[in-house]
Design a protein with these regions (language model features):
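Conserved N-terminal helical subregion
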Residues: 2-78, 84-91
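Short, solvent-exposed loop/helix junctions and linker helices
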Residues: 33-37, 147, 221, 275
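FAD/FMN-dependent oxidoreductases across multiple families
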Residues: 141-231, 236-241
Length: 307
């Protein structure tokens, strides 16, 4: 259920291209694509064998409540945590496509002249010919694409992907949501109903980025790791609800998130500019970056989380 990404190809809206290669980085894979149902099943199995973890179906009193319900978190709103949102003029369409040609463990991305961004992520399966798709497009185009019959939708996607994987067939339902960059002003606080207890945000409940870099889940996992380290390293006498601990976690994660947020937003802004000088500049920049050596290696390590 986990598919290695051994190559990554990013194509601009003219002739700019960037290639990443796992072998060049000395690693077996640049990333791993995991099916959500498989990941959820494994997590459920793991929880069953953790005697200190109990699954509950209703709120229970606790010294610390970790709020990780997603970007539309109701609990975050009830706690009064302000969430600064900068909407993008795009909606994401997510689905799966069966491809005539095998994906070859290559992740592909296309930037179009109209600002649309199409990403193919390789999935496991017979023949290696299924990809997960995220297509970021303007809201009117999203509505148009979602209204198409399956065959017509596949033809539009085949054209947008320049026929890289041959004939495409829709292999799942289509989902859509509006895109935004967002971050909570404060990630932790005291529970209004219990001054001795605290809350803390993690994952999409704390921050959102554009999916063009494919880092959303990784950033959330980074939150979980950082929070576990801060709490696990506390003095024995200190409660997990100590706001000094939780603010340390908040500072660490905000610092870690800043470069990725700036890079993601910067790329989106650059490729959403009108054609003309901007189109020439960004494609020239892609070609220069592809031959930049140390800079390209540094960016690859950042994306892989190896730094």
């Amino acid at each position: 259920h986990a598919t290695p990404v051994t190559h990554m190809r990013v194509q601009g809206d003219q002739d700019g291209e960037v290639h990443f290669d796992a072998a060049a980085q000395g690693v077996p894979a640049l990333a791993w694509i995991v099916d959500v149902p498989a990941l959820e099943t494994r997590l459920q199995d793991a929880v069953r064998f953790q005697p200190q973890v109990e699954l509950v179906q209703a709120p229970v009193p606790a010294a610390l409540t970790v709020v990780c319900e997603g970007r539309a978190s109701r609990t975050r709103s009830e706690l009064g945590a302000e969430f600064d949102i900068a909407p993008y003029p795009q909606h994401a369409i997510a689905t799966r496509m069966a491809c005539e040609k095998p994906h070859g463990q290559v992740a592909r991305q296309w930037f179009s002249p109209d600002g649309s961004i199409l990403a193919f992520l390789p999935l496991s399966g017979e023949g290696g010919s299924t990809v997960a798709v995220v297509w970021s497009v303007a809201p009117p185009l999203a509505a148009e694409l979602l209204a198409l019959e399956a065959d017509a939708f596949a033809q539009r996607m085949q054209a947008a992907s320049q026929g890289a994987l041959g004939t495409l067939t829709l292999a799942s339902e289509r989902a859509t949501w509006p895109l935004q960059q967002a971050q909570a002003r404060h990630w932790c606080g005291t529970l209004p109903t219990s001054p001795a207890a605290a809350w803390v945000l993690a994952g999409d409940a704390a921050h959102n980025v554009h999916p063009l870099t494919g880092q959303g889940l990784n950033l959330g996992l980074g939150d979980a790791q950082a929070l576990a380290q801060v709490l696990g390293g506390r003095d024995a006498w200190r409660s997990v609800s100590d706001l000094r601990l939780l603010r340390r976690y908040e500072r660490q994660r905000k610092t870690a998130l800043a470069p990725m947020g700036l890079a993601t937003d910067g790329l989106h802004q650059l490729f959403s500019r009108p054609q003309g000088p901007w189109q020439t500049l960004r494609n020239w920049g892609m070609k220069g970056f592809d031959h930049s050596g140390p800079l390209k290696d540094w960016m690859a390590r950042q994306a892989m989380g190896t730094r």
